[in-house]
């Protein structure tokens, strides 16, 4: 039987175990923003009894903007209805990332079952990163990135419909027509990781969409360099660059080999924040690619399956011009395009989404895809609209079954 008081205690212990969640931002004497650990930010979590009807109304007003200075940057509430128990957790991205969610959920489950929560090394990690900035390797990494990726003739996202500094949020999400098992075959065929595969698909889509060969994107590396950091909650991921200069006679397999090398070198030199130092809103935006396990697959708690409930984000802002997220789950893969709706018409993003899906479908399902050139891939896309529709139709039937 599920014990709600026991869950509340597990929640409180897990939150207290992660310093990033009890961190606040403030200004120092020089007017610089600093972050400080403040355990007094933790408040007691209580069980709130409410009806399913009232909770259904309340849930879409739970997510609201945070006060950023001298304030707690997470919210946690527990609700009990006549039907279920619900945990609401909202946290600002400045102290939390996708890996952090997995760590927190694992710790809640372990604490609920009476197991100890591993040590969190958040502030030690920040100190190590500060110290790294004063090393010779940091300077070597800066030179590596600048020599490899500097220049102003790259395209880094599909052409926008409107030029503005307004930052409204839009999203398109859909099933991809690809299973995790099929991706396993792709990894062996092209000798790339799933992350590298989708980075390449994204770059090809941007290039074909605008008709230009030189593309520079960023991709998300979780930033956890050792086992200790794998238990650490915080905004620790790194945005790393990757670039392409497509030629019509270039073999797709050779492109994948180059991407694999770039990804490995970028991780090696990830102590230098090249993308963060060079990306400016509007003038220096770079589309970002993220492949990850779908965080909505929350797993179970002491043998009881956890279900996630989507709720509305109020006053949401776009984090970048375009985030291309591929979410992998047991049910298949989902594509999510998070974009600046103040700069893109929805119809533009719908056309880009279809192109991304078609490139994926050809590379995954077409016979001899590993022998295609860039021109051959483009030809397949132009003549094979029916193939794409057939693949998506078959996948939809498979999902229903």
Labelled PLM ranges:
Residues 1, 8, 19-21, 27, ...:
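His-Asp-centered acyl/peptidyl-transfer active-site segments
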Residues 79-123, 349-364:
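Active-site-proximal acidic secondary-structure segment that organizes catalysis
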Residues 53-58, 101-102, 139, 167-185, ...:
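AMP-binding/adenylate-forming domain of the ANL superfamily
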Residues 37, 264, 292-299, 346-401:
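Flexible, non-catalytic linker and terminal segments flanking ANL/adenylate-forming cores
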Residues 1, 28-50, 61, 70-75, ...:
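Acyl/amide activation-and-transfer machinery of modular secondary-metabolite enzymes
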Residues 8-53, 72, 121-170, 384-401:
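Short amphipathic alpha-helices and their capping loops
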Residues 18, 22, 105-106, 213-220, ...:
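Extended, hydrophobic beta-loop-alpha segments that form or line the acyl/peptidyl-thioester binding
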């Amino acid at each position: 039987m599920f014990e709600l008081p026991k869950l509340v205690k597990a929640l409180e212990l897990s939150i207290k175990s992660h310093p990033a969640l009890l961190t606040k931002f403030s200004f120092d004497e020089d007017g610089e923003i600093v972050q400080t650990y403040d355990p007094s930010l933790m408040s007691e979590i209580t069980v709130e009894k409410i009806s399913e009807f009232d909770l259904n109304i309340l849930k879409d007003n739970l997510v609201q903007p945070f006060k950023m200075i001298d304030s707690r940057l997470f919210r946690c509430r527990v609700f009990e209805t006549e039907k279920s128990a619900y945990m609401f957790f909202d946290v600002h991205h400045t102290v939390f990332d996708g890996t952090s969610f997995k760590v927190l959920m694992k710790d809640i489950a372990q604490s609920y079952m009476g197991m100890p929560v591993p040590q969190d090394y958040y502030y030690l990690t920040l100190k190590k990163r500060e110290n790294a900035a004063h090393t010779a390797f940091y300077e070597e990494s800066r030179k590596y990135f600048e020599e490899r990726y500097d220049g102003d003739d790259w395209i880094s996202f599909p052409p926008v419909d409107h030029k503005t500094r307004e930052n409204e949020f839009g999203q398109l999400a859909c099933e991809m027509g690809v299973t995790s098992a099929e991706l396993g075959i792709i990894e062996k065929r092209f000798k790339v990781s799933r992350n590298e595969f989708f980075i390449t698909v994204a770059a090809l889509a941007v290039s074909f969409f605008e008709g230009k060969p030189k593309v520079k994107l960023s991709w998300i590396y979780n930033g956890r360099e050792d086992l200790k950091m794998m238990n650490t909650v915080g905004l620790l991921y790194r945005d790393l660059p990757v670039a392409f200069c497509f030629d019509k006679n270039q073999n797709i397999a050779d492109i994948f080999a180059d991407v694999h090398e770039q990804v490995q070198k970028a991780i090696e030199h990830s102590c230098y924040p090249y993308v963060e130092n060079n990306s400016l809103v509007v003038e220096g935006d770079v589309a970002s690619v993220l492949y990850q396990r779908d965080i909505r697959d929350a797993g179970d708690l002491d043998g009881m399956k956890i279900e996630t409930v989507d709720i509305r984000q109020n006053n949401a802002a776009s984090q970048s011009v375009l985030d291309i997220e591929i979410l992998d789950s047991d049910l298949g893969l989902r594509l999510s395009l998070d974009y600046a709706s103040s700069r893109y018409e929805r119809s533009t993003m719908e056309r880009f989404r279809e192109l991304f899906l078609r490139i994926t479908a050809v590379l995954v399902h077409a016979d001899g895809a590993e022998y295609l050139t860039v021109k051959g891939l483009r030809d397949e896309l132009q003549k094979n609209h029916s193939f794409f529709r057939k693949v998506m139709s078959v996948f939809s039937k498979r999902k229903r079954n």
